Swiss-Prot record:
Family: Belongs to the LutB/YkgF family.
Phylogenetic placement of the source organism: Bacteria, Bacillati, Bacillota, Bacilli, Bacillales
Identification of the protein by name: Lactate utilization protein B
NCBIfam families membership: LutB/LldF family L-lactate oxidation iron-sulfur protein
Biased composition (Basic and acidic residues): 461-477
Region (Disordered): 433-477
Length: 477
């Protein structure tokens, strides 16, 4: 699965999302639940704004010194017996991974949850070589066996499915014969996946944070699949975005606490795993060979720009869990594996405006996302910067919008034209008026009035009213 999901146009995806009543209900319920948990976890920690500021400082410091910490990380991984590969593009990353798998004669691969591997289309690349790649995160596994259904949420990828749908998928694909009770579904998936773990040649993981001064990589999970992926297969490959790094375990401790509280409202998740290189002599478990693939794929182009702060993201999805737009249209409407406010900022930067020019406009600019972000990314401001760039630098504004803005600018710059326009506006809008409102507007108003009414121009103009008042009081002009 690549970063882009589906071939539908943005408006079609949004329409499908609005029509999906179950999805909207599930998203609304999940948002309320996760938001309440996050607020309670923040209250329990105390001094939440100070913790946010500290987390922001850590992420800013890393980005400003990223070359130093990446070099330190690579050196320490190599010292511990691991291999490091810097991939500038998605193709370079998948090419290296495919080469490692071929050299190890790997055919069966187990994988823990990783957004960056989906971004670079890794699964499809390995499957084209005849490998079996099995997602072991339960949500990702459900989506994979359901014809590679794309994720709709960064933390809860199968949020858009209910238990009855999951039951039917299990019955059709993995021989399930029981009810839709979650515990029965989980037990069946566990039995199927346990066999996959034991048969695997290669384990592939993502990385929540890499620790530069020890050469370690960390996994934050609630299911324990990450530990099985990293301890049973003989070869482990970890894939990380180049920005997902901290100087030491001191900074890691701060960020992982902010991550778990912001994502699911927990003090800590069930499993926090730090792995440092391949198995050493005398150790009971762990891989015999370890590879770390550090992916750029457009991230270096963001460094040093007005959008650099988006790379502070720790993938907690707190912004998604408070977004009113996501609440109504769901994750698939964004057309990217990165949904919600963070996706609306990041996807155009990594994937370009050709595919994602609408996303910066998929926002009410209420700033709830910026307030929720544990590392203080000013998401609503970045969305505005995107809009400005789209119009001024990219020249991608619709022709109708350009003409409307030019007409408005011309009219408001000349008092005589403004006076004439305000005088004739009520008559011009009369054919579209119904019960004092415009219900089916022309031109640029058409899309607006498809879903809401537009106030009709009033025959009584403010300037006339004001002038009459002045005359009544005998005031001079």
């Amino acid at each position: 699965m690549a970063m882009k999901i589906g071939t539908q146009k943005f408006k079609e995806r949004v329409s499908d999302g609005l029509d999906n009543e179950f999805m909207r209900g599930a998203v609304s319920s999940a948002q309320e639940r996760l938001r309440a948990r996050r607020l309670e976890a923040a209250k329990e920690l105390g001094n939440w704004e100070e913790w946010r500021s500290l987390a922001e400082e850590i992420r800013q410091h890393v980005l400003e010194n990223l070359d130093y910490y990446l070099e330190q990380l690579a050196e320490n991984v190599a010292k511990k017996g691991g291999h490091v590969f810097f991939a500038q593009t998605a193709e370079e990353a998948t090419g290296y991974i495919r080469d490692v798998v071929k050299k190890k004669n790997g055919k069966k691969i187990v994988k823990s949850k990783s957004m960056v591997t989906e971004e670079i289309n890794m699964n499809e690349a390995l499957e084209s070589d005849g490998c079996e790649v099995v997602e072991t995160d339960l949500g990702e596994y459900i989506l994979q066996i359901d014809d590679h259904d794309p994720p709709s949420h960064i933390v809860a990828p199968a949020l858009h499915k209910n238990k009855e749908q999951i039951r039917d998928v299990f019955k059709e694909r993995i021989g399930y014969r029981n009810t839709e009770k979650p515990e029965e579904l989980v037990m069946h998936a566990r039995a199927v996946l346990r066999k996959k773990f034991l048969e695997a040649d290669i384990g592939i993981t993502g990385c929540n944070f890499a620790i530069a001064d020890t050469g370690s990589v960390s996994l934050v999970t609630n299911e324990g699949n990450g530990r099985l992926v990293t301890t049973i297969p003989k070869t482990q490959i970890t894939v990380m975005g180049m920005e997902r790094i901290v100087p030491s375990f001191d900074e890691f401790e701060v960020l992982v606490g902010m991550l778990t509280r912001s994502a699911v409202g927990q003090r800590l998740t069930s499993y926090i795993t730090a792995l440092t290189g391949p198995r050493l002599p005398g150790e009971a478990d762990g891989p015999e060979e370890f590879h770390l693939v550090i992916v750029d794929n457009g991230r270096s182009n963001i460094l040093g720009t007005e959008f650099q702060s988006v790379l502070q993201c720790i993938r907690c999805a707190a912004c998604i869990n408070v977004c009113p737009v996501y609440r109504h249209v769901g994750g698939h409407s964004y057309g990217s594996i990165y949904s919600g406010p963070i996706g609306a900022v990041l996807s155009p930067l990594l994937g370009g405006y050709d595919d994602y020019k609408e996303l910066p406009y998929a926002s009410s600019l209420c700033a709830a996302c910026s307030e929720a972000c544990p590392v203080k990314i000013p998401l609503h401001e970045l969305l505005l910067k995107h809009r400005q760039r789209i119009v001024e630098k990219e020249g991608r504004a619709p022709i109708s919008e350009k003409l409307a803005m030019k007409a408005f600018g011309l009219g408001t710059s000349a008092p005589s034209l403004y006076k004439m326009g305000s005088k004739w506006a009520p008559a011009a809008m009369k054919p579209f008026k119904e019960d004092g409102k415009i219900t089916k507007g022309p031109g640029p108003l058409k899309q607006w009035t498809q879903i809401r009414d537009f106030p009709a121009p009033n025959k009584s103009r403010f300037r006339d009213w004001f002038e009459d008042r002045r005359k009544e009081k005998g005031e001079d002009k």
